[in-house]
Every structure is written in C-alpha cells, then in structure tokens.
Amino acid sequence: MARSIKKGPFADDHLKKKVEAQSGSEKKQVIKTWSRRSTIFPDFIGHTFAVYDGRKHVPVFVTEDMVGHKLGEFAPTRTFKGHAADDKKTRR
C-alpha cells in the first residue's frame, strides 16, 4: 500500500543532513546508511550511498530516474544462485 499524499515522502533526517553537508563541498564521499526505507529526493542526485543489504554495504549512485523510489530497491537482499540443471542429457 502506498504512502498517503498528505503525509508526503519520507527520508531519515540524518540522511538529509549528510547530503546537505556534502552538497557544499566539492569532494563527495560515499554516504554509508542502513536506511533502506528512505525515499530518494532530488537533492540526492549525484551522491553515492552505501546501502546495507543485510551483510554488506552496496554502493548506489543516485541518478535522476531514481527520484521517488526507495534506497532499498537498489540493494537486493537475496542472491539468486540459479535453478537446478536439467540432467536429461546425461541420463542416456
């Protein structure tokens, strides 16, 4: 279910403060975060976030197309190993 329009988008305050602090400086460092629930704002464009996926931090470079999505959408939590191989050829 989507968030109510009257509430507006959500992003953690500590994340906004870190982006504002880096916007003033020329050198942009990777912002490490555990906040997968935060919505990507237009201010975040051009910044790199290290989003935690449960075991490591995945680097996510924010582009214009990502605005409005959540940070967690770009750091998958599950690794797909592939389906079992079909052994019909080797049985003959």
Swiss-Prot record:
It comes from the Bacteria. PROSITE patterns: RIBOSOMAL_S19. Gene3D superfamilies: 30s Ribosomal Protein S19, Chain A. GO terms for cellular component: cytoplasm; small ribosomal subunit. Residues 9-27 have a biased composition (Basic and acidic residues). It holds the Pfam family Ribosomal_S19. Signal peptide: none annotated. Keywords: Ribonucleoprotein, Ribosomal protein, RNA-binding, rRNA-binding. One of its GO terms (biological process) is translation. Residues 1-27 are annotated as: Disordered. The keyword rRNA-binding applies. One of its GO terms (molecular function) is rRNA binding. Protein S19 forms a complex with S13 that binds strongly to the 16S ribosomal RNA. Belongs to the universal ribosomal protein uS19 family. HAMAP family: Ribosomal_uS19 (MF_00531). This is Small ribosomal subunit protein uS19. It comes from Staphylococcus saprophyticus subsp. saprophyticus (strain ATCC 15305 / DSM 20229 / NCIMB 8711 / NCTC 7292 / S-41). The lineage of its organism: Bacteria, Bacillati, Bacillota, Bacilli, Bacillales. The gene is rpsS.
